[in-house]
Design a protein with these regions (language model features):
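Short hydrophobic segments within beta-strands
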Residues: 7-9, 37, 90
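A generic "alpha-helical surface" signal
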Residues: 13, 62, 102, 144, ...
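Helix-loop-strand module that forms the ligand-binding subsite of alpha/beta enzymes
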Residues: 39-127
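Residues at the starts of beta-strands that form the adenosine-phosphate
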Residues: 3, 33, 86
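Glycine-rich phosphate/pyrophosphate-binding loop and the adjoining helix
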Residues: 120-190
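N-terminal beta1-alpha1 ligand-phosphate binding loop
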Residues: 2-29
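A generic structural motif
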Residues: 29-35
């Protein structure tokens, strides 16, 4: 059974709300165990435990929060021992254009330095709304497309863990039995 950790830092509760939605998305794929943990309660054992990880951070000055960065800096003695995990990112920002995509890229860079395989999501969760670099929000996720982008990120992580860790090829995203585009986008294409 694949194991997914949704690890987040949340200052005002917005990133935590996103993390809960990401965890809901993970639960859409059967046979995947999920843990939801704030960075303040996590430790190195949680990182060793998981096969896949969704990292979430608020955007502070266009990048990762110092709390999230400090956690990974303190994990440096474990570098090269965590290689091969699957990772993705999500971030909240104060307003659109606040740098959440840059934060997701910074989170993925941290994971890449630890040898993780990282990905984005090409699905369209709403009109002109994707999670190529990870799920991003301005404030808390309120609109359906924002909620769905978090869930899709979690589901995609669970799919990749099922495929690469559990060997369940039928869980490949391209074989999914769900629409990879929103209703609005699908009807526009027809």
């Amino acid at each position: 059974m694949g194991k997914v950790l949704v690890l987040y830092h949340s200052q005002d509760g917005n990133t935590e709300k996103m993390a809960r939605l990401v965890a809901e998305g993970v639960c859409e794929i059967p046979g995947i165990e999920v843990r939801l943990k704030s960075i303040q309660k996590a430790n190195r054992d949680d990182i060793y435990w998981c096969d896949g990880i969704a990292l979430g951070s608020p955007t502070h000055f266009g990048t990762v929060s110092s709390t999230m960065k400090k956690f990974w800096e303190e994990l440096l003695p474990d570098w090269q021992k965590l290689d091969g995990k699957i990772g993705c990112a999500f971030s909240s920002q104060g307003s659109w254009g606040g740098g959440a995509e840059l934060t997701c890229q910074a989170l993925m860079t941290i994971m890449m330095n630890y040898g993780f395989l990282v990905f984005g999501v090409t699905d369209i969760s709403g009109h002109q709304f994707t999670a190529h670099y990870g799920a991003t929000q301005a404030g808390e996720p309120r609109e359906e497309k924002q909620i769905e982008s978090c869930r899709r990120l979690g589901r995609r992580l669970a799919e990749w863990v099922a495929v690469f860790i559990d060997g369940r090829k039928e869980s490949h995203p391209l074989l999914g039995k769900y629409s990879r585009h929103s209703e609005k986008e699908t009807s526009k294409e027809e």
